[in-house]
Each structure stands twice: as structure tokens, then as C-alpha cells.
Amino acid sequence: MSDTPQSPAQDSLAEHDEARPMRTVKSFVMRAGRMTEGQQRGLDLGWPKFGLELSDEVQDFDAIFGRQAPRTFEIGFGMGHSTLEMAAAAPDIDFIGVEVHKPGVGALLNGLLTQGLGNVRVYSCDALEVLRHCVADASLDRLLLFFPDPWHKKRHHKRRIVQPEFAELVRRKLKVGGVLHMATDWEPYAEHMLDVMSAAPGYRNQAEDGRFVPRPQERPVTKFERRGERLGHGVWDLKFERVD
């Protein structure tokens, strides 16, 4: 074990991680990671300003953001590059991002401080718990799930976040007309997503052919996607609209 003391922000993040009961099957794995100076700055200075704690009560996001605005919920923002790009391009939209990887949380928070953005709030915990407990039903305009872990091995498929229960939870939280936008670079997972969502009640596939949509302009291209394109790899986008 390290003898390095934790920062106050790390203590705050750890408190709610330890206080919550664990779900039986997680769609993610907690990874240890070293903090850069910028990421630590983000946690120390950005968490008190932009960080939110998991609660058992539905949150008033109008009060939290200080306005009424279209609301986007992002599951697993990684290092936050896409979130920053989307938030900067759409200052009239409020973003709620959730990520369990602390260096990624620190990186996004540092970016918010550096760019002076105020339309993003951040959770560092299980996104499904945030949806269940903190987000009001029929309150989200969009939910983004970009490049989730595909859990390639068959015995791990139960860990995939996109399951019938996930589809129903998201449907409840989206407004009628709200959209679930997913993207993956693993074709078998894309087919799995399509199968699950096509069978889920209350949704309409926005793809003209009933399968995948062309890459939407509003989704930033990641460095991994650019590398994949050079190698001839594909990316599949799915958009399902809540209709009921």
C-alpha cells in the first residue's frame, strides 16, 4: 500500500464509493492509475465546483446548473475529450458525465477549469446507480454511451451494459422524443446492441434501414476511432428514440 496521503477530493470520492452496496454484476472494472499533475489539479480544484455525490434522492438539476436547458447524460466519458468538445460546441446544453476511472475524472475536471466551461457536472461512480436514484423519470433529452467495454469473451457477455434491463431504465429516464445514442467499434457488440434495443418496447430505431445510422456530426471522433479507420476498422452508431 502507498503511504501517500489522499487529497480532500479523493477522500470525498472514496466515501461514496465505499458507502454504496455493490451490484452483483458490474459492466466495468475499476483500474488503478497514476494521476498527472493536471488530473490532480482537476480533482482538487474542479471537484468542489463540478463534482456531484451519489444520492438516494432525485436531484434538481435545474437548480444545480442554475437554469433550465436540454440535458444530456453520458455514461463512461473516459478521459473526457469528447465531453469537453461537445460541451464547448453546445453551451446551451447541460451535460451530466459519469466515469469511474479517477484519472479520467481528473482530466475532465481540469479541462473544464482550463476552458472555463460551466455546463458540465460530473459523477464518479456507477452510472446505473446515478440513473436509478438521482435522475428524474422523463427528464433527459439524450443519453450517450460511446465505446463501452464490449466484453469480448462469451462468458463475460453478462457484463455488457446493454441488456434489456438497461434499455428499460434508459427509456424511463428519457423524455418522449429523447434519444439513446450508442457507438461501438466491435461489430459483434453492435449486433448485440441492435438485437437488445430492437426488442425493447417503447423505442423507435432512427436508422432508415432499421439497423445503424451514419456517424452523427455531433459525436466527436476519438483518437482510437481515427487509428481504427487507418487500420480499416469500422464504427457502428445506433440511435433509438423513446416513443412511449
Curated annotation (Swiss-Prot):
GO terms for molecular function: tRNA (guanine(46)-N7)-methyltransferase activity. The active site is at 149. It catalyses: guanosine(46) in tRNA + S-adenosyl-L-methionine = N(7)-methylguanosine(46) in tRNA + S-adenosyl-L-homocysteine. Substrate binds at residues 153, 185, 222-225. It is an enzyme of class 2 (transferase). Catalyzes the formation of N(7)-methylguanine at position 46 (m7G46) in tRNA. The gene is trmB. This is tRNA (guanine-N(7)-)-methyltransferase. It comes from Pseudomonas aeruginosa (strain ATCC 15692 / DSM 22644 / CIP 104116 / JCM 14847 / LMG 12228 / 1C / PRS 101 / PAO1).
